[in-house]
Design a protein with these regions (language model features):
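ATP-binding N-terminal substructure of ATP-dependent carboxylate-amine bond-forming enzymes
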Residues: 1-47, 51-53, 57, 64, ...
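Active-site nucleotide/adenylate-binding loops and adjacent lid/helix of ATP-dependent enzymes
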Residues: 7-10, 51-133
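Short beta-strands and strand-loop turn motifs
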Residues: 18, 40-45, 71, 92-93, ...
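Glycine-rich phosphate/pyrophosphate-binding beta-alpha loops
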Residues: 22, 98, 153, 219-233
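Phosphate-binding site of ATP-dependent enzymes
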Residues: 105-186, 207-214
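Conserved metal-phosphate-binding beta-hairpin within the catalytic cores
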Residues: 128, 139, 192-224
Length: 233
């Protein structure tokens, strides 16, 4: 999976900065390899990385801890789902950067969304669509940073809106009541505690029209580009 010379080079470093995304980078494989070789690295360990990367596994860990998350089911390639409440969100189980994520409003869009998600992996997550505002909360050494609101100018916070400069309005601190912000920070910290995430991470959340908070996922290697969220917090 990795060229030997890359690992040899990493062994010589005092600390390896983890700037990887997607499979092998965020799912704990690199972290586990580094642990076996005694290589120090930034970010959380292999187990919490694996839990956070898998949306299916994360739900199994976070929901029993009382953390509010959208209802959803896991669907494997070739299997059918009997009932789908529209609109719904379809996403690859272990994807990142919103790649392969779609919102389906009817059966036709749902089938198209499944085809798109299954083109990336064999397991997808089908979740209820929460109509609300999007937020993100960074957690540094167990302590939540200020809440940031994400307002895409078009559509939802997909891959294009995440990485194309000027496509999304981001407000930090978010223009929300202090008690709501405190709740979001609490749930972000709770997510990281439950999944065993240390050092730093970013938790994505939604706020519906009734001020109900929903936690979406934990990003253990959040983006650090000019358009990324954590540098703004």
């Amino acid at each position: 999976m990795y060229k030997r010379q890359v690992l040899e080079l990493c062994k010589e470093a005092d600390m390896v900065f983890m700037g990887l995304h997607g499979s092998n980078g965020e799912d704990g494989k690199v972290q586990a390899t580094f642990d076996l070789l005694g290589i120090r690295y930034t970010g959380t360990d292999y187990l919490s990385s694996a839990i956070s990367m898998s949306k299916e596994l994360a739900k199994k860990v976070l929901v029993p801890e009382g953390i509010p998350m959208p209802k959803g089911v896991t669907l494997h390639k070739g299997h059918k789902i009997e009932y789908v409440p529209f609109p719904c969100v379809v996403k690859p189980c272990c994807g990142g950067s919103s790649v392969g994520v779609s919102i389906a409003h009817n059966e036709k869009e749902f089938e198209e969304a499944l085809d798109e998600a299954f083109s990336y992996e064999d397991t997808v997550l089908v979740e209820e669509f929460v109509d609300g505002r999007e937020f993100s909360v960074a957690v540094l050494d167990g302590k939540a940073l200020p809440v940031i609101e994400i307002e895409p100018l078009e559509g939802f916070y997909d891959y294009k809106n995440k990485y194309k400069a000027g496509s999304t309005k981001e407000t930090c601190p978010a223009n929300i009541p202090e008690d709501i912000a405190s709740q979001m920070q609490f749930w972000a910290e709770k997510c990281c505690q439950a999944a065993g995430v240390t050092t730093y991470a970013r938790v994505d959340e939604l706020l519906d029209k009734n001020n109900n908070i929903f936690c979406l996922e934990i990003n253990t290697l959040p983006g650090m580009t000019d358009t990324s969220l954590i540098p703004q917090e």
